[in-house]
A protein has these predicted regions:
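Conserved pre-motif I regulatory segment
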Residues: 1-12
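Conserved Walker A/P-loop ATP-binding site and its immediately adjacent core
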Residues: 15-53, 136, 218-223
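Conserved interdomain hinge at the start of the Helicase C-terminal
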Residues: 26-27, 176-229
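Loop/turn-to-beta-strand initiation segments
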Residues: 33, 73-76, 98-101, 123-129, ...
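Conserved helicase ATPase core of P-loop NTP-dependent helicases/translocases
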Residues: 45, 60-73, 89-91, 214-216, ...
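Conserved helix/coil segment N-terminal to the catalytic DExD/H
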Residues: 66-101, 112-117
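Post-DEXD/H (motif II) to motif III coupling segment of the RecA-like Helicase ATP-binding lobe
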Residues: 100-101, 106-166
Length: 262
């Protein structure tokens, strides 16, 4: 309701709140041609799927501008800012003139060049941003607010109804040098096979006890080492890395969704 009271601004809600469903309800309420800016192909596919599920549209009724696709209907479209922002200024303005509502998903990214060009060229009535992260490490969030508007509402959600226990283990077989560059410290951790064995054995033990485990690491190389060590112990382990091709990524996400549903 708060979003309908104003013509633009940023809605902040935690992961799992249902920002996509909220945005679709907004689209349905305003009943104007809508463009949704989404930062990645994976999220674009998720948006298209949610639109089909909640609005009863067929895939071909939803315009998509991303990677190799460039088909905007001017009615309800989902676009990658990187792809859309490559249009010549006049063509970009002409495309944007079709819309009365612009929704920027993950709007904390909107200080980037392609977003700026699009947002400056948009002249429609309604402009909303969605984010779970209303802060940027580089301090550019004020620029995002200048482009989209101030925070209009904030919601939180507890994804779990139990306390989170944070356990920190000393898992390295050799002491790290605190004065060494961070990159070198990570190199040592990745190469520490005793540490890898400790991590993977803990994961396997928890899986056998019926737990669901998410392992995060910032290096693709490290993830591949961990995944290789886990293979053979359980057929439900999946690996998702930044260097995967789109079809590989989609296959992994499909398998992951099946595991989560089970």
């Amino acid at each position: 309701d708060r979003m309908l009271e104003v013509e633009g601004g940023i809605f902040v809600a935690g992961t799992g709140f249902g920002k996509t469903v909220l945005a679709l309800a907004l689209i349905n309420a305003l009943k104007v041609p809508t463009l949704i800016l989404v930062p990645s192909l994976t999220l674009i596919k998720q948006w298209v799927q949610r639109i089909q599920e909640h609005m009863g549209l067929l895939a071909e009724q939803i315009g998509v501008c991303a990677v190799t696709r460039d088909r905007l209907t001017g009615i309800l479209d989902v676009a990658s800012p990187r792809k859309l922002g490559k249009k010549e200024p006049k063509k970009l303005e002409a495309s944007l003139s079709n819309y009365g509502l612009l929704i920027v998903d993950e709007c904390h990214h909107a200080a980037a060049g392609s977003y700026v060009e699009i947002l400056r060229s948009y002249a429609g009535k309604y402009l909303y941003g969605l984010t779970a992260t209303p802060k940027r490490r580089d301090g550019k969030m004020p620029a995002v607010r200048m482009l989209i508007g101030n925070e209009i509402d904030k919601a939180s959600v507890e994804l779990v109804d139990y306390k989170v226990v944070k356990a920190v283990m000393s898992s390295s077989s050799k002491p790290l040098c605190p004065d060494a560059p961070y990159v070198l410290q990570v190199d040592d951790l990745v190469a520490d096979m005793q540490r890898t064995q400790l991590v993977t054995s803990s994961v396997i033990d928890l899986v056998r006890r019926g737990r669901r485990i998410l392992v995060l690491t910032e290096r693709v190389e490290h993830m591949k080492i961990l995944f290789k060590a886990l293979q053979g112990s359980c057929d439900q382990f999946v690996m998702l890395t930044s260097d995967m091709k789109p079809k590989q990524r989609q296959a992994v996400l499909t398998k992951f969704a099946g595991i989560s549903a089970g």
